[in-house]
Amino acid sequence: MTKSHVIFSASIALFLLLSISHFPGALSQSNKDCQSKSNYSCIDKNKALDLKLLSIFSILITSLIGVCLPFFARSIPAFQPEKSHFLIVKSFASGIILSTGFMHVLPDSFEMLSSPCLNDNPWHKFPFAGFVAMMSAVFTLMVDSITTSVFTKSGRKDLRADVASVETPDQEIGHVQVHGHVHSHTLPHNLHGENDKELGSYLQLLRYRILAIVLELGIVVQSIVIGLSVGDTNNTCTIKGLVAALCFHQMFEGMGLGGCILQAEYGWVKKAVMAFFFAVTTPFGVVLGMALSKTYKENSPESLITVGLLNASSAGLLIYMALVDLLAADFMGQKMQRSIKLQLKSYAAVLLGAGGMSVMAKWA
């Protein structure tokens, strides 16, 4: 399922870049530079190529370190899901993901879709970036909600079957209400606690697995777009700062994703597949940008619209996941609610992560 999502998102990005050649009202006739590459003073094609090759390996390595660190550091309290330190580290990573959506991806989308290279009608008449980001967040909520509902019904059926095998068929199972947490009511006799706890654990694990898959999907789309921008440009001044910022970004975003994958309790094969696709998507985007450098022009209307819309959809997904499924779920959880001190530490971690990534917006 994860592999197909990644291939699907990569295929969409490539398909749009290659096939979308004419949008209604895309080209502003007054701007003659829209079909050409940007003209900067520090353009050096040969040096840029060396920096791009270096960026592929450096981003790949830092991404692998970030996403795999939670898997192999279980002896460290900060990477043990049952420990309070894990919530603090996860809050830091969630702040990075939140800032990525608000400070990096969404502003780029607004800038691209309001470019003078696009005609006033319709691109300057309507805030497409905000609209697409909003619809992306709503769509993510819909997928999140419907998927959880489907699997919750399946879990209830399994629970009824377990109870029926022990109790009489006419005995009812207590109502289970799911909204971030599981609230138990009445179950017959000695099965009350055991079965309700089992269903609660099942639903919580389900939430973690949905979270891990949807979060990875959003990160993959965003990473391909970022990689495209690195692979396409020959501006050495831009690449240097961008690569350094991306290494920092990928490592800590990988830690956030790795923590979610760890909580999902996948087998080692699926963990390896998800970590691999996270690590290779940005380098893949760089290679794709290099391959399309002759046809992909960052200021062309086709590229501005395609990348702008992809950025907007990715931003909506990342913002939703960071606020709803990561931060809200943890801060409203029992462990956080029982400790004001832990909440304050976690808020500080969120601000530190979001603040650090906001500063990185100067270069990336």
From Swiss-Prot:
Record topology, Cytoplasmic segments: 74-85, 147-209, 263-271, 325-343
InterPro entries in alphabetical order: ZIP, Zn/Fe_permease_fun/pln
GO molecular function ontology, one term from the record: zinc ion transmembrane transporter activity
Topology class, membrane: Multi-pass membrane protein
Residue numbers on the Extracellular membrane side: 29-52, 107-125, 231-241, 293-303
Signal peptide residue numbers: 1-28
Record field: transmembrane: 53-73, 86-106, 126-146, 210-230, 242-262, 272-292, 304-324, 344-364
UniProt subcellular location: Cell membrane
Pfam families: Zip
GO annotation, cellular component aspect: plasma membrane
Keywords carried by this UniProt record: Cell membrane, Ion transport, Membrane, Signal, Transmembrane, Transmembrane helix, Transport, Zinc, Zinc transport
Protein's job: Probably mediates zinc uptake from the rhizosphere.
Family indicated by similarity: Belongs to the ZIP transporter (TC 2.A.5) family.
Protein name, per record: Probable zinc transporter 10
